[in-house]
Amino acid sequence: MASPELELVRELIELNWHTRNGEVEPRRIAYDRAQEAFGNLGVPPGDVVTVGHCTAEWVRPARQDGRTLLYLHGGSYALGSPQSHRHLSSALGDAAGAAVLALHYRRPPESPFPAAVEDAVAAYRMLLEQGCPPGRVTLAGDSAGAGLAVAALQALRDAGTPLPAAAVCISPWADLACEGASHTTRKAREILLDTADLRRMAERYLAGTDPRHPLASPAHGDLTGLPPLLIQVGSEEVLHDDARALEQAALKAGTPVTFEEWPEMFHVWHWYHPVLPEGRRAIEVAGAFLRTATGEGLK
């Protein structure tokens, strides 16, 4: 049964969510400011470090048990930042008992595909170079960031780099061709995303690359040899079938995968955890998954 807060959150989204059209820069500003509606829960900006061609922010939650989480924010690849997702990445890090490195990967149109993948790979390698054991490192991302996490895992595997312990995929955008039936069947139930806008954003990111390229759309990739994945998706999302396709790709490859469909939930409901109990519960589930993958009792 959904919480009493759910309807209020849905109304707030419909009243206040940023425009789905227009130039990228105003949308970026609106996206970063959107979190102010719920606040960053007193989480101050962390130390900013250079990672190759981009930057990242260390978010150090209250709980740290020798684990590190590389967080990749959503925003259709062109929007979002560590700032817009600080309250989410911090909460997930706290639930996972991990310090969080939130990556500010390069974004289109300035830096199209595969820049974001290159940055995610560079950030993970930096963690290893700093002495983080791969078995104590995990990846997580929401929406485009979830697809990016699985893309980075494929690239790391292909390069022979030791892989992290696990990855969490929140409402993954895993098929940039936007071919899933849920783009039609759940259109009337979706309150955040618009398929036409997603296609425009995909074109901007891909800059002529085939939308089925496995490092752009991991639902079309070979996921053999990847670490365990947790996929969480809401029942009301137009990206529901992206999540299912990603699960099926993992199953086909023999990669351990846990799929969770959360009834009545919308795209990346975790982002609203300051006011939405279901968001808090989903974060706790994801955190427990990451703790288990990295060794629950280890220090």
Swiss-Prot record:
The name of this protein is Acetyl-hydrolase
According to the UniProt entry, its GO molecular function terms are:
triacylglycerol lipase activity
Gene Ontology BP term (one)? antibiotic biosynthetic process
EC number, as in UniProt: 3.1.1.-
The record's disulfide annotation reads none
Q: Which UniProt keywords apply?
A: Antibiotic biosynthesis, Hydrolase
Q: Which Gene3D superfamilies match?
A: alpha/beta hydrolase (3.40.50.1820)
Q: Which organism is it from?
A: Streptomyces hygroscopicus
Q: Where is the active site?
A: 143, 237, 267
Q: State the pathway, as annotated in the record.
A: Secondary metabolite biosynthesis; bialaphos biosynthesis
| Main function | This protein removes the N-acetyl group from bialaphos as one of the final steps of biosynthesis of phosphinothricin tripeptide (PTT), also known as bialaphos (BA), a natural-product antibiotic and potent herbicide.
| Family affiliation | Belongs to the 'GDXG' lipolytic enzyme family.
Query: Motif range for Involved in the stabilization of the negatively charged intermediate by the formation of the oxyanion hole?
Result: 73-75
Question: What InterPro entries has UniProt attached to this entry?
Answer: AB_hydrolase_3 (IPR013094), AB_hydrolase_fold (IPR029058), GDXG_lipolytic_enzyme (IPR050300), Lipase_GDXG_HIS_AS (IPR002168), Lipase_GDXG_put_SER_AS (IPR033140)
Read off the Pfam families from this record. Abhydrolase_3 (PF07859)
